[in-house]
Amino acid sequence: DEFHRAGAECWGESTVALLKLCPEAKLLGLTATNVRYLDNNRDMAEELFDGRVASDMTLGEAIVRGILPTPNYVTTVYQYQKDLARYQTRVDNLHSAGIQDVNQKYLDALRRALEQADGLDKVFEHHITNKSGKYIVFCANKEHMDEMISHVPEWFAKVNAEVAVYEAYSDDPGTDKAFADFKTDESDKLKLLFCIDMLNEGVHVEGISGVILFRPTISPIIYKQQIGRALTAGDTAAPLILDVVNNFEGLTSISGLQGEMQEA
């Protein structure tokens, strides 16, 4: 299972050793992401199975065929300051004073418009319709997670006055209990599970209303694994994907997903 991991150094050495011990064994591999995009685009289906793929269903095909629900995908302007700084640098580097003045006026107008745009509290209030639902919140690291949790009263109070916050990360001895409590919590509170490098793959939680992406990533694998936590086969309700950091902008997987759906 998850045979793409055989491309990693330690996993790969162990896989080769195991195959040498069992040369006559019949080998079956399962994965949702056979291509290791951040490892020179290595296709582990080619390396391990010589391209013998018995069955292949893309995420787009699964959505079109109704196996997985079509999510409600929401993006935000949460990180617009970084974009404005990048655009300001480009304007400053223009050589023509006239062109620079015109572009500066457009940029200033954009800055004023963004400053008046809804904050995350308004975004969450509007889009989180299941006020007592369960949401997985993906964070980059412990410091980042602590910062995001500190904003819970500010960001989620208009969704639900009562919020249950759970934390899950590998170095925390209380993770197993927190994860179990999150899964069994049937209260009327809004349930938020903040996690770091967990629940990306191999673990699926039933009854998830959506995911909130606070972790920037350029990996299509991590991106699909994270949004996949909101997609459960057979569900009829549209799960919510709140892409706060706009991961979709830097990933070719979005255009790829559109292509998969059109082809299906």
Indicate residue ranges for each PLM-predicted region.
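SF2 helicase catalytic motif II
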Residues: 1-36
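A short beta-strand-to-loop transition that corresponds to the Sensor-1 phosphate-sensing loop
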Residues: 2, 30-34, 141-142, 196-198, ...
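Conserved Walker B
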Residues: 2-4, 199, 215-217, 230
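Interdomain helical connector at the RecA1-RecA2 junction of SF1/SF2 helicase-like NTPases
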Residues: 39-133, 149, 153
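SF2 helicase motor core recognition
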Residues: 66, 192-211, 227-232
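Conserved segment of the helicase C-terminal RecA-like domain
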Residues: 229-257
